[in-house]
Amino acid sequence: MKYKLLPCLLAIFLTGCDRTEVTLSFTPEMASFSNEFDFDPLRGPVKDFTQTLMDEQGEVTKRVSGTLSEEGCFDSLELLDLENNTVVALVLDANYYRDAQTLEKRVRLQGKCQLAELPSAGVSWETDDNGFVIKASSKQMQMEYRYDDQGYPLGKTTKSNDKTLSVSATPSTDPIKKLDYTAVTLLNNQRVGNVKQSCEYDSHANPVDCQLIIVDEGVKPAVERVYTIKNTIDYY
C-alpha cells in the first residue's frame, strides 16, 4: 500500500502544492459593506470583483464593483442600481471614503477601514468587539444586523416610526456553499416576501454564477421574479 502512494507523493513534490486554501470566514469589512451596499459577500484574498444582477430578459439591473487591499480594506467601491436610479462611486482616502467624481467626503471610517458615519444622512454605525457593524441609526430609523459564527450576514431588522421590517436569512448547512440561502421578509410580523438563491462556486468557495428567485408576497397574487448573478473575481 505504501508503494502505491509513492508515485502520488512524488508527483506532488515535483509539481508543488498549488491547491487553494479555502477561507470559510468573512471579514468584518466585507460582511458589513455587503449589508450596507446590498451585494453578496466574498471570502478569501479578493483583489477586485464585479457582481452583476440581470433580469429574465438578460438586462442588467444592478452592478457592484470593488477593489480591495491585501489587508481586506475596500480601496474603491462602485454601485450602479438601475431599478432605483442610484449611482455611488467611492474611493478610500485615509479615514474617509470620498466621492470618486467630486472628491467630497462621504463616509467617515473607524478602526482599520470600517464604516463609522454617513454625515450627509445623519447615519452612524456601531460595531461589536470583532469589528462587525451591528447597528446603524439616525433620527428616522434604527437597524440591527445579525451574523453567524463565520461572519456571514443572517439578516437585519429596521425600525422606523411604527414600522418594523425584518429580513432573516438561512444559509446552506454546507460551509462551502454559504451563498445558497433562503430568506424571509416580515413587515410588522406579517410575511411579505421570500428569496431563494443557488450558486456555482470557485476554488475559494465564492459564487461565480447564481440564480436568485424573489417572491413579492405583499401583492395578490404573489409575483415571482427570477434573476441571474454573475461574479468576476480576481485574487491576490
From Swiss-Prot:
One Pfam entry name: UPF0257
Q: Which residues cross the membrane?
A: none
Instruction: Give me the residues lipidated as S-diacylglycerol cysteine.
Output: 17
Kindly list the places in or outside the cell where this protein is found, as annotated in its UniProt entry. Cell membrane
State the membrane topology.
Lipid-anchor
Q: Name one GO cellular component term.
A: plasma membrane
Q: Which InterPro entries match?
A: UPF0257
**Signal peptide from the UniProt entry:** 1-16
Q: What is its main location?
A: membrane
Q: Which cysteines are joined by disulfide bonds?
A: none
UniProt keywords (A-Z) are: Cell membrane, Lipoprotein, Membrane, Palmitate, Signal
| N-palmitoyl cysteine lipid sites | 17
Q: Which family does it belong to?
A: Belongs to the UPF0257 family.
The entry's protein name is UPF0257 lipoprotein YnfC
